[in-house]
Amino acid sequence: LVTGASGGIGGAIAKILGENGYHVFIQGRNQKKLAQLKISMSGNCEILLGDLNKSDDRANILNLAFANKPVDLLVNAAGLSSFVAFEDTKPEMINELMQTNLITPMLFTQEFIAKSNTEQNAEQKQVNVVQVGSAFGYIGYPGFSTYCASKFGLRGFTEALAREYSDTNIRFRYFAPRATSTSINAVSVDEMNKALGNAVDTVEAVAKTFMDFLNSKKRQQVVGWPEKLFVRINGFIPKLVDNAIQSKLAVIKRYLQQS
């Protein structure tokens, strides 16, 4: 079950899962995009249309997904981004972004666990719950304060659940892409990445890395270099990352003014 499948990363993950023999349920709010994705996918695929921010839709989606047999993989890929100076961020945007990126995935994960525990077969097959986060769930970055807060929260939530459920058949994992070429990005973000020389991945490359991650025993995965290094350094010597970002701050703020 892949949420946010009408988006770039979610759609690419759904597609590669289908190519690897999974029966995939694709969730989203855009019927047209989901229909186009289904046509492009190989293997079995079913559309689950609904808004995860609505409790009735979440319940209906899970009932349909579990109708015939238990679901052994949930990928929460639905999300929003925001590149805005914090003082210019409207309260409505903060609420919407935190709801979509953190609170709704928490609620849907809770409901998925309950459904999985009820419907799980006698073999107790391993279940994977993967939250699609971001490298900005490890590194606070100017202009993305609200987005970073949501992804930091999602990572902490995943880490806590992984430990809480370590004696069960459910594994909780966090997958963190870096900058990726998708429609979620504002034009100013794309232009800033070019100006700073930041690497930007295709959704296909991200999906391939996701598949490798899924087939591994890793609990967390940061996509790309030097982001992996920056994450490690930020954990031990954050001042070095402070200095690196400080040297780029004038450029970042120039593009913030355009957002």
Regions found by a protein language model. Name each.
Residues 77-82:
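Conserved NAD(P)H cofactor-binding loop of Rossmann-fold oxidoreductase domains
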Residues 85-86, 90-98:
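Substrate-binding pocket helix/loop in short-chain dehydrogenase/reductase
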Residues 109, 150:
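Active-site helix of classical SDR
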Residues 164-225:
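SDR active-site lid
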